[in-house]
Amino acid sequence: MAVLSTNNATLTILVANALPIKVENFDPNSDMWSVDDLQTADGEVTPDGQFNHWAINGAIQCTLNLSGGSKTSKKLEFLLNNQQRVGQSLSYIPEVSVVVTLNGETETYVGGILKQGKAGRSLGYPKINPTAWVFLFPRKV
């Protein structure tokens, strides 16, 4: 499920110490969930050529596209704005997980952070601008 462009899927965002957020009101003009290729893998090979295992390197970056009027978008904006700072660095970032379910298949992204929310092009009225929410995850279960 690298890219979802259907509204038949169910997305749930789990934030540390908070109730789950059921995602609604996707941006109809873009993919609702996409996984970017920030993940690489290397194989461990011994000097005699024996292959042992794959190791995953890097983070998984996922983008969630919501319409501007989405209640989920407002909750994510609140979450992003309330990350605590000490000087220029973040001191508290709540851990997030995202569960994606489509046709009985479930993918779970755990141990991530909400990185940013990027507003889309202005349509003349800011409340209807779509927003792309970017998450970073170390792994997918």
Question: Which residues are covered by each model-predicted region?
Answer:
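Hydrophobic lipid-interacting interfaces of membrane-associated proteins
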Residues: 138-140
